[in-house]
From Swiss-Prot:
Residue ranges, compositional bias (Gly residues): 561-570
Protein name: Phosphatidylinositol 3-kinase 2
GO molecular function, one term: ATP binding
Gene (UniProt): pikB
Natural source organism: Dictyostelium discoideum
All residue ranges annotated as the PIK helical domain in the record: 1326-1503
Length: 1857
């Protein structure tokens, strides 16, 4: 779609396929000549389409008698060359608020509005002066003004058809086919009347019209001569709901004709016309199909038109027509099909019962006619033959054919429910029609059973003709027979659509399907009757039905009966209506409530399975069945439907349709359903699938066939799906698809599937994830899409074997020790029957091979039995007691690039110091303990893998419903565009390389292109022939003439490039104003298949929503509101809703509010509809909405009854938030949200969190529900990244020195003179050209050097952006620059991508900042993720906690971060995958993230191989321990608790071996029960001692906690480890002890026990209690007892000084609170460390309002005694160490702030908002120099030493415990 030609007109009642259409629009009121006085208005549309392959051109005229988006003024609107021109524009809209809009159901508009309309008409008609309106006025008036409506019926009513027959009067009104000369003259006349202001346009249009045939010939040649002739089909549809006159003629003196010509870029068509005519006297619905060998154009008598207005009005009208909601189009359309040569004269169709309460007139009719003439015959309307479509019965009608039809009943009249409308006796007789044209088609509609089924058969033929005839009845069978080279996808009509005939073209089956992008929570089984539809509480863009909003989002193939996919040319009628609102009466309030109740019905997945049959040559039939059916029932029913439907007629060789000859087979897994009498649900295969909510496709194949390859007869690449009905008993559904997208070659191997084993595996997977996850699998399209994509990823990356051995070693991730001794001692545990330990001394730099050789020699000397016949290669070294190995490099086998290591030993082998364990032992002066064991572990370098058959089924799964299935095939959203660009990168690279060489040629070509832009299409086509055949760039000029540089013949690749820009006012600009637009090379033009979707960048309409009501209002979970409004008497509750738009946590516009409404009742479950009949309009156009924009809604209750809009901020501050919800405005496929939805609100007592979850509160049983309706448009709006279209991602990405692949973006000039590439850095903006003054320079430097918590003001952003080029060499400044970008300005976004590529390369730790929620742009986040992916496995593991948390900031499940996390987790299951699993698993109880984390867990568990068994064992042990821990907590008394503990532990059945969640290297085989105990703290944690799996190894001791949230501890310990690495890398080893800690569930987790340590409280207690606490030498004495010699004691003192300094600095920086003697421990070797980090970031504990902790950190006199006193050298060393460590951390302030910022999404109570991190910034004092910071910290040491409250706190705590 061209940028400037994608005009969205509400009058465009047909949706173009892949062609462009232009329209001339005219509207006038019924005059006195009308016999019905209906007051309606008529519309005629003449459109021209051109197929892309066969050059079949179809012109259809649609005449519609209904409302238009203007008053009945008799004036004309003309669209010419995509630029609107107003002959005499009337201010047709009164500027009233939405609350004044009258209802569609009102028979007469409000008198005030009617009076105002007449005054406007009289004023303008008298003055003769055109009134101009600004774009904003027109846009605002569009939604704020009621539309003119026919008094005979509501605009929302459906056309109700009775008998369908031909009439001479109806036929005479059908347009005839004039000669080409007449057409050209008529066009010239139109141009003379309407285009006086632009002679060039007149000439151009004349040329275009006069050269139609030439252009068509050229286009045919350009399209590789696929067709040699052009066929034109003219279809005319006329609709009226008012009585017809006695006679009518083919033209009227009041009629006016407008023609508009458009050269279609997508379909390679020449000039054609589209005419819109209104006739108030034409009443019947007539469809005429004419086929001729030459081009034809429908014409009527033309009348003169006033002069054309100015360009200002054109722009205003352009804004209007781009963005209006659609008008009602209640016309079931029919594809232009083959000739119908014979139609039975006896017409019979099924009845539809009209509600008796409806006012029915028998004097009007709607007739549908299909006719076609042979190519040699003349196109005369008299040859038209009527084909019956629908018969509707009423009180005034009979079953016999007649011309009498009931008018549409007034929807304001109440009607009965749908179930009462079905006649007890309905019959349906077959109707046959034969075609004598190129394709013979027989269509039969019959019924033989009480349940309906629907069959669709597609036949690949070279022509593009299709006929659809449908009938309604209680039992019906629908057939669609398509003979299309490009498959058409006619939308089928279900039985339930009796009362929804107005939406006939949008019907998508019996159920209303939840579309992910519209969030329509409507039950699939919901049936809306007419009364409900007409009483929609609020329909912006679709006034009379919720269904209208739903169907508006369907693809064109589902939205149109005749609309075709992939080149289909039938018109596409979308049933979207303009805004209507009505203040409901009591009865309508109930109807409204019913509709919203149906919207709120939870969505459940239906248990259907698809059966595919390909026995009919060239056709594929797919039918749906319930899985409760048996195979024999399915086969019998399937073949019965085929036979009853007469689908086998015309086949020379009929297939055998005997059920016994066929079998049901799942081809994707090559498995046959053998038990014919057992229901599918009970089959083992289906049981395995049903656990995962999967239903595989079954194929009906002959039993003799062992393997099957799906038929690939269809060669088309566009896949279409036809939706069908579901029967009353839901027995079957049938769709049709082209075979191309479903081709699967099945392996010839007859591998037997262990189905029972797979069932067990599925049960294990879902037990690991959590039983609640199964409900997530039914949540919608995004979930299904993600699961399928993940399965495809697994299968595409599948290898029969993989190397897991590299995961067993830990190399080069620990910093090297500060001091490396010349010799290290290794204690080696030798294999054998006894415990044999041998000491080996070796050099630290010795290779592993040499050390192992030395050890084996000593082993052979000791034990000849175990070494006989063996060599050193039969053994390997491992860390004693841990699953960690010390291997030679050659023992690892073949490694991937990710597994590559860099050994430093001799001969290319690892040295001992390469291993982390050796480094740790040397750094801590510990003995190295290794074991010599057999080399069975080496088998892990060839681990075999198997593909789960569930993966194969997942890979071929499609969406549950047909509309979603089709949408997934036909969508061409932003993601599809991005993928298409990536696929073409190799071709684009060559284009970029040749740019400079062809620069001069391009300039000449552009000049020629510009000079010829106003010429005819022949010149444009000649222009295109000059393009390079290797890569043709089709440059589209958006100019006032609206000409396209036609269509290219392209031998290798064809890249359609859009040219044009948006000026500062948001208006499109083109070459018509004399400026040449940039040529964008290497970017594929965003083309929408069949024009089914509208690019968002052309929708200028303001974004708006309507808040319709509330349900389940209650204050149960809000203590403030409950206390304030408890009695409901003293304080009357009032309610209002605040709506906000956010992007990256920042407001896009000011908040908007509903009026404050009084609550009549609440808490009773009723639906409240306050007086909120005012749509909320935000001040941002839709086209400027970023991809990740979100809407936030907060419901407030208040005592204030009324307030002005300017006072609402104050009202909010005095109100109580009782619920909130967020929602993304675009779904995962880039589709803008439309239609109604019901939000289940979160009730945590806070206003909407702008970076909070976007999922509903599914956990609450009765949450408050907010009913919101989003505006709907003619077609779904798809996000288009304009910045992506104006730059190209170079496939040859630049590689930095450290191997980081960063995106390289090639930008091109926006200069008007050239299309040559820009330099890497664009010129600065005008503000950047001004010289910086001193103050600005200082301010800019301060901003660029500031920490991530600094908030940029508007002036700051302007300053940073203006001088962005100055700091491009500073990596840290990139984040500030990105924050200064206005992300709703496409030019700035494009520039941001360029700058990001040219900026100095970030370090991976710096890139973490860009993953914060503030950076919402997808490309920016992906840029950071690519850099982060350069982390080593050890570094990646260090930051894995943050990376899993920022998954919550990703708007969609499928993202680059998701991919990288999964890939890295699978590449190293031990170091990354293990913790990745537990980080996700521990939060599966959180409803906000359950869906995303569950999907990732499922994907990982299906991919991780044997690691899943390890996790299953861990989970089993944890469940058993949790049961015991809960039993202990529920028991009183010390002795009883101990008894319960011992009994419970002894009953646990442990696996033979299992890993502990703390560390996968820790392997155990059971518990040493007599060493286990419970601890005497508040939560009663368990002290557990596990028996090591390795004999003679030390046991594993852990603390198992239940009831404690360990997430804060995990974060604190992670930061401690990172601090320790910073210090070690800076040459400071502070001997920290950051013990291991992991959360495994909600309040469940494990902690590592540091052995040989005791708490300070216990040491003082053992030494005498309170008296010992007051004694300074207590700790000194204890330490001397543990270290007998002076040397050992001095060494312990040194260790204490270093560790104390480390924890003093760390606890001060992180603000660790609740520090007392029970939370500080010391080992016998002098290591001091802190535990239990329940409070941090300065959240110190208080007692009775007083702050108990006043010291900045803990440094007591007892500590000072160990150091040696204030005057000792040790104290000076301690102070110096503290200051140095403090300054090292200060240099990494940004990293620590980022680590905490990225954890804001965890929900940790003390880390909720960014302000909580302010303490961290203040503690690190980034504004101080090192000297100032050291001085400040020295003062804090003195303060801590002299603070007496620390001692008092310890005393009180000791007494309490």
């Amino acid at each position: 779609m061209k940028m400037s030609e994608g005009i969205i007109s509400p009058l465009s009642l047909s949706s173009e396929s892949s062609e462009q259409q232009q329209a001339a629009i005219r509207k006038f009121s019924n005059g006195s000549n009308g016999s019905g006085g209906g007051g309606g208005s008529n519309l005629s549309v003449n459109s021209s389409n051109s197929g892309s392959n066969n050059s079949i051109r179809k012109s259809s005229t649609l005449m519609y008698n209904g409302p238009l988006p203007s008053i009945n003024d008799g004036k004309e609107l003309l669209l010419e060359n995509s630029k609107p021109k107003v002959v005499e524009l009337v201010n047709t809209f009164n500027h009233k608020p939405l609350s004044t809009i009258h209802s569609v159901h009102n028979e007469i508009p409000p008198p005030a509005i009617e009076k105002e309309k007449k005054e406007i008409i009289n004023t303008i008609s008298n003055s003769g002066v055109t009134k101009y309106m600004t774009a904003l006025e027109i846009l605002d008036s569009t939604i704020n003004t009621p539309l003119n409506r026919s008094r005979s019926g509501s605009i929302g009513s459906k056309p109700i058809c009775n008998n369908l027959t031909s009439s001479s009067s109806s036929s005479s009104t059908t347009a005839t086919t004039p000669s080409p000369t007449t057409t050209s003259n008529n066009n010239n006349n139109n141009n003379n009347n309407n285009n006086n202001n632009n002679n060039n346009n007149n000439n151009n249009n004349n040329n275009n019209n006069n050269n139609n045939n030439n252009n068509n010939n050229n286009n045919n040649n350009n399209n590789n001569n696929n067709t040699t002739s052009t066929t034109t089909t003219t279809t005319s549809i006329l609709i009226s709901s008012s009585p017809p006159p006695s006679s009518s003629s083919s033209s009227s003196s009041n009629d006016e004709q407008f023609n508009n010509n458009n050269n279609n870029n997508n379909s390679n068509s020449g000039g054609s016309s589209r005419m819109i005519t209104s006739k108030s006297q034409i009443k019947p619905l007539i469809v005429t199909s004419n086929t001729a060998a030459t081009t034809t154009t429908t014409t009527t008598t033309n009348t003169s038109a006033p002069t054309t207005p100015t360009n200002r009005v054109q722009s205003s009208l352009d804004d209007l027509l781009f963005n209006l909601p659609t008008i009602p189009s209640n016309v079931p359309t029919v594809n232009g099909g083959p000739k119908i040569s014979a139609v039975p004269k006896k017409v019979s169709s099924s009845k539809l019962l009209i509600p008796p309460s409806s006012n029915v007139s028998s004097s009007s009719n709607i007739t549908l006619s299909l006719s076609s003439s042979s190519p040699s015959s003349s196109s005369s309307s008299s040859t038209s033959t009527v084909v019956p479509i629908v018969q509707l019965s009423s009180s005034n009608s009979t079953n016999s054919p007649s011309t009498s039809l009931p008018t549409t009943p007034r929807l304001s009249q109440p009607t009965t429910s749908y179930t009462q409308l079905i006649p007890s006796q309905q019959q349906q007789q077959p109707t046959e029609s034969n075609s004598s044209s190129n394709t013979n088609t027989t269509t039969t509609s019959s019924s033989s059973s009480s349940s309906s089924s629907s069959l669709t058969i597609s036949s690949p033929q070279p022509s593009n003709n299709s006929i659809r005839i449908s009938a309604f009845g209680r039992s019906s069978t629908q057939f669609t027979i398509s003979s299309n080279g490009i498959p058409s996808s006619p939308g089928q009509v279900s039985n339930k659509d009796y009362n929804n005939i107005g939406n006939l073209s949008n019907s998508s089956g019996e159920r209303v399907k939840n579309k992910q992008y519209s969030m329509l929570n409507i039950s699939k089984k919901t049936i809306l009757d007419e009364s409900d539809i007409s009483s929609s509480p609020r329909s912006i863009g679709s006034p009379n039905s919720i269904r209208a909003s739903i169907s508006s989002q369907l693809p064109p193939s589902l939205s149109s009966i005749g609309g075709g996919g992939g080149g289909g040319s039938g018109p596409n009628v979308v049933s979207n209506k303009p805004l209507v609102v009505k203040k409901p009466s009591t009865s309508e309030h109930i109807k409204k409530e019913n509709i919203w109740r149906q919207t709120m019905i939870p969505l459940t997945k239906e248990d259907h399975i698809k059966v595919v049959f390909e026995g009919i040559p060239g056709k594929r039939v797919i039918q749906k069945f319930l899985i409760d059916k048996t195979p024999i029932e399915i086969k019998s029913k399937f073949f019965e439907d085929l036979k009853d439907g007469d689908l086998l007629n015309g086949l020379t060789q009929l297939p055998s349709l005997i059920p016994e000859h066929y079998e049901l087979k799942v081809l994707s897994v090559n498995s046959t359903i053998s038990n014919e009498t057992l229901p599918l649900r009970r089959q083992t295969l289906m049981q395995a699938c049903n656990i995962s909510r999967l239903f595989p496709k079954l194929h009906l194949i002959l039993k003799s066939e062992s393997t099957t390859i799906l038929d690939g007869a269809s060669t088309t690449t566009t896949t279409t799906t036809t939706t069908t009905t579901t029967t009353a008993n839901q027995s079957s559904n049938i769709i049709t698809k082209s075979n191309s997208s479903l081709d699967l070659t099945i392996n010839n191997s007859n591998e037997i599937i262990d189905v029972k084993g797979h069932i067990q595996a599925e049960l294990e997977i879902f037990e690991l994830i959590g039983t609640s996850f199964t409900r997530v699998l039914d949540q919608g399209q995004e979930v299904v899409s993600f699961r399928r994509d993940f399965a495809q990823f697994r299968l595409s990356n599948f290898t029969s074997t993989r190397n897991d051995l590299s995961q067993m070693i830990y190399v080069s991730s620990e910093p090297l020790p500060l001091t490396i001794p010349n010799k290290i001692t290794i204690m080696v545990l030798l294999p054998g029957d006894g415990k044999i330990i041998k000491r080996v001394d070796c050099c630290p730099n010795s290779s592993v091979g040499d050390v192992k050789k030395e050890i084996f020699k000593k082993f052979a000397m000791i034990d000849r039995v175990h070494t006989q016949g063996k060599t050193q290669d039969d053994f390997v070294l491992k860390v004693t007691g841990f699953r960690e190995y010390i291997l030679c490099i050659h023992e690892l086998g073949n490694l991937t690039s990710r597994q590559r290591f860099y050994p430093t030993g001799s001969g290319g082998d690892f040295s001992l110091m390469d291993y982390d364990y050796i480094r740790q032992c040397v750094g801590k002066n510990q003995t190295v303990e290794l074991s010599l064991t057999n080399n069975s572990i080496l088998s892990l370098n060839q681990v075999s893998e198997k593909v789960s058959f569930i993966d194969k089924i997942l890979e071929t799964s499609d969406f549950d419903d047909y509309d979603e299935d089709l949408d997934s095939i036909n969508s061409n959203s932003f993601d599809d565009l991005k993928q298409s660009i990536q696929q073409q990168q190799q071709q684009q690279i060559q284009t970029v390389i040749n740019i400079k060489e062809t620069n001069k040629e391009n300039k000449d070509s552009n000049k020629e292109n510009k000079d010829s832009s106003s010429n005819n299409n022949n010149n444009n086509n000649n222009n295109n022939n000059n393009n390079n055949n290797n890569n043709n760039n089709n440059n589209n000029n958006n100019n006032n003439n609206g000409n396209n540089n036609g269509n290219n013949s392209n031998n290798n690749s064809n890249s359609n490039i859009s040219r044009g820009s948006i000026d500062s006012e948001g208006n499109g600009s083109g070459s018509g104003n004399g400026s040449e637009q940039p040529t964008l090379i290497g970017v594929q033009n965003f083309s929408l298949p069949n024009n089914s979707k509208l690019p968002i960048n052309i929708v200028k309409r303001l974004f708006r929503v309507n808040i319709a009501g509330l349900r389940n209002l209650n204050f149960n979970n809000n203590e403030d509101a409950r206390n304030k409004f408890a009695d409901g008497k003293n304080n009357q509750p009032n309610v209002f809703v605040m709506a906000e738009l956010y992007y990256g946590g920042e407001l896009l516009t000011n908040p908007v509010f509903t009026p404050i409404a009084q609550l009549a009742s609440y808490g009773d479950g009723s639906v409240e509809f306050p007086n909120w009949e005012k749509g909320i309009a935000f001040t941002i156009p839709i086209r400027y909405l970023p991809r990740a924009a979100r809407a936030s809604f907060t419901v407030y209750v208040t005592t204030i009854s009324e307030a002005l809009e300017s006072q609402m901020d104050e009202v909010v501050s005095k109100s109580i938030p009782i619920g909130w919800s967020n929602c993304l405005l675009m779904n995962h496929k880039g589709m803008l949200r439309m239609g109604p939805t019901a939000f289940r609100l979160w009730d945590d007592g806070r206003r909407a969190n702008p970076i909070g979850t976007c999922v509903d509160n599914q956990a609450a049983k009765q949450p408050i529900i907010l009913l919101v309706e989003f505006e709907s448009f003619i077609r779904p709006i798809v996000y288009v990244d304009t910045a992506l279209q104006s730059m190209m991602v170079n496939d040859s990405s630049s590689i930095s020195s450290n191997g980081v692949e960063s995106p390289s973006i090639v930008s091109f000039s926006s200069s008007a003179a050239s299309s040559s590439p820009l330099p890497s850095s664009p010129l600065p903006s005008p503000v950047g050209l001004k010289k910086l003054d001193l103050d600005e320079a200082r301010r800019l430097k301060a901003l660029m050097d500031s920490d991530p918590l600094v908030q940029l003001s508007a002036e700051d952003k302007k300053l940073v952006y203006g001088y962005r080029h100055i700091y491009k060499s500073k990596p840290k400044a990139l984040a500030k620059f990105l924050l200064s970008v206005n992300w709703i300005d496409p030019d700035q976004v494009t520039d941001a991508y360029r700058q990001m590529n040219d900026w100095a390369l970030l370090k991976p730790v710096q890139a973490l900042e860009i993953l914060d929620a503030k950076f919402a742009d997808e490309h920016v986040r992906n840029f950071a993720i690519k850099i982060i992916n350069s982390f080593s496995d050890a570094e990646f593991s260090d930051f894995l906690l943050q990376l899993t948390q920022v998954l919550k900031y990703e708007p969609y499940h499928n993202s680059d971060l998701t991919h990288i996390l999964i890939q890295r987790a699978l590449s190293n299951r031990s170091r990354i995958g293990h913790f990745f699993f537990w980080f996700l698993k521990s939060e599966m109880h959180t409803p906000e993230i359950e869906e995303r984390y569950g999907l990732l867990l499922e994907g990982y568990l299906r991919s991780c191989g044997t690691h899943r068994q390890d996790l299953i064992k861990q989970n089993q042990v944890l469940k058993s321990l949790h049961t015991v821990a809960m039993a202990v907590k529920q028991t009183n008394g010390s002795s009883e608790r101990k008894k319960v503990l011992m009994e419970g532990l002894s009953k646990i059945k442990f696996p033979d071996t299992f890993q502990l969640p703390l560390d996968p290297r820790w392997e155990a085989k059971g518990l040493i029960i007599d060493k286990c105990r419970y601890m005497d703290s508040k939560k009663l944690p368990l002290w557990l001692v596990f028996e090591n799996v390795e004999p003679h190894a030390k046991p594993l001791t852990v603390i198992f906690k239940v009831g404690d949230d360990l997430r804060q501890d995990i974060l604190t310990l992670q930061v401690l480890r990172i601090m320790d690495k910073f210090w070690k890398n800076s040459g400071m080893d502070l001997r920290l002890q950051p013990y291991k800690c992991i959360a495994t569930g909600d309040g469940i987790g494990m902690l590592e026990v540091v052995l040989n340590a005791n708490t300070i409280a216990n040491i003082n207690k053992d030494a005498g209690g309170t008296g010992a606490l007051l004694e300074e030498k207590t700790l000194v004495n204890w330490l001397k007892e543990c270290n007998k010699t002076e040397a050992e004691y001095n060494k312990a003192v040194e260790t204490f000084i270093l560790s104390c300094a480390g924890y003093v600095v760390a606890t001060y920086v992180m603000g660790i609170g609740d520090r007392h003697s029970d939370n500080i421990m010391i080992t016998k070797l002098g290591h001091l460390f802190h535990i239990d980090f329940g409070h941090f970031l300065g959240n110190y504990k208080k007692k009775y309002g007083f702050k108990r902790e006043r010291a900045p950190f803990i440094f007591t006199p007892q500590y000072m005694a160990i150091v040696g006193g204030k005057d000792s050298e040790n104290f000076k060393r301690f102070v110096t160490t503290c200051c140095s460590a403090y300054n090292i951390l200060r240099k990494n302030t940004d990293l620590f702030i980022n680590l905490f910022q990225l954890m804001l999404s965890t929900g940790i109570p003390e880390l909720q908002v960014a302000e909580d991190i302010d303490y961290l910034r203040k503690a690190l004092a980034p504004g101080l120099s090192d000297e100032e910071a050291a001085e400040e910290f020295t003062k804090n040491i003195s303060v801590a030493l002299n603070t007496k409250t620390v001692l008092l706190n310890d005393i009180f705590h000791g007494w309490a415990h």
